[in-house]
Amino acid sequence: MITPEDTGPPCVIDDGEQGSALRADTASYPGLVHPSVSEPLTRLPDGTVKQRNPFTGTEVWTVPGRGHRPLGLVRPAPQPLDPAQHGRHCAFCEHRMLETPPEKSRIVSMRADDGAPAWQILRHPAAERLEETTPAFRRVPNLFEILSYDYWRLNHGYELPPDARRRRDEYLATEAGRAHVRAVVATKLRASGRSAEEVAAMPEAELIAASAGFFGGTHDVVIARRHFVDGAVDDHQLASSGTLTPDEHHAFLALTADAMRDLYATTPAVRYVSVFQNWLKPAGASFDHLHKQLVAIDEVGAQNAAALGRLREDPQVFNHAALDVAVAHDLVIAANEHAVMFAGFGHRYPTVEVYSTSPVGQPWRQSAAELRAVSDLLHAAHAATGPDVPSNEEWHTRPPGVADPMPWRVMLKWRVSTLAGFEGATKINVNTLSPWDVRDRVLARLRELRAAGALADGMRIGADARVRPGMLRYAD
């Protein structure tokens, strides 16, 4: 159950004055950016902005005059929704739950003992009980995983642990469970190139044997209940992260963090769990239905390796090369008690970054208040971005096998440009929006959303954010 108790150490943002007058010319503020950080942002006389990512070295140029173009998709005219298809628009929809593999967990709305609204995580519901509760979000294995069950079995000697075998046997002990597993395995085999006749001729035991990854796999999907917003009348009214309520978004993150914990705990060879969200097909989504993915891998990954290299040179690099630079260049957008949001720099796509200020760098170990703080700022970033903008949400966390402390940070990247020959030939990425353009767009929209009551309480926006250098406490 998600409860409001704060079980972790407090991470209070200093209420001292932020340098709200800070602008791009950091020469006016000697000593604000740490001397170990080479200049990541340069504005040329013609208005061109050159950026370099302090962790990856990615080079980005923003040329003037292109920052006011609309960002969202150009779509055909909206089509009315068929009421008879409510909850059945795609394989992730709430009335098609038997088209996804057996659930690992779901989060449902409930009432606490004192009558207050709360959330509860239910684990491994049986096939015949899926309709007994209404999941706001549900965690299921990815039918087409990046790393298959056989990858772990053949390369690492992985076998289903006893708990997973027990859950598999219990699920298959009922006719509803067996029928569900047979049907989903058959769907996967047909999609993989088997003919319908071949699949139909397979013995049940062979179909069941192919389901091991449903109970011990390492690529999960966390699926939202809604495909369209409540009351939608046409197919342009998709339900996105930003159309959730702040409470719903918190539940979304809580179930995802719980899934991270579980993947690390159940597969010893896992070195890192990558968490991401692809929104809309131009950003890589298979369905225009809100979901996050978790992929466990047996390496820490190149992104973490680059960050760890910088971290070992400078243990405060996430302050010196990220937050402090954002403060110096007036890129801070918002903050609350345990997190800060700013316009990112040195990214291939325009990016909004949310950093946890907690000393705890792994989401599932953070207190309820710390997790909620990141959730509220990330929800605000999505709401300000809007449901028509393709985006990738990327989580970056400390791998459990790494001793060096790292902050939990989330990047929301707007997929509003297409890589072409210039980028491939030069490795210089051209963006239409500078970090200041991103800041201005998000700030303007946040003020509108706050006036409409759509944001969580406790958020300080713009000059009121009162963010100062060195506030990330991951190295405490």
Where do the language-model regions lie?
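Active-site microenvironments that recognize anionic phosphate/pyrophosphate groups
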Residues: 2-289, 295-361, 384-396, 400-476
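Hydrophobic alpha-helical membrane-association signature
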Residues: 252, 370-374
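Long, repeat-rich segments with strong aromatic
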Residues: 364-368
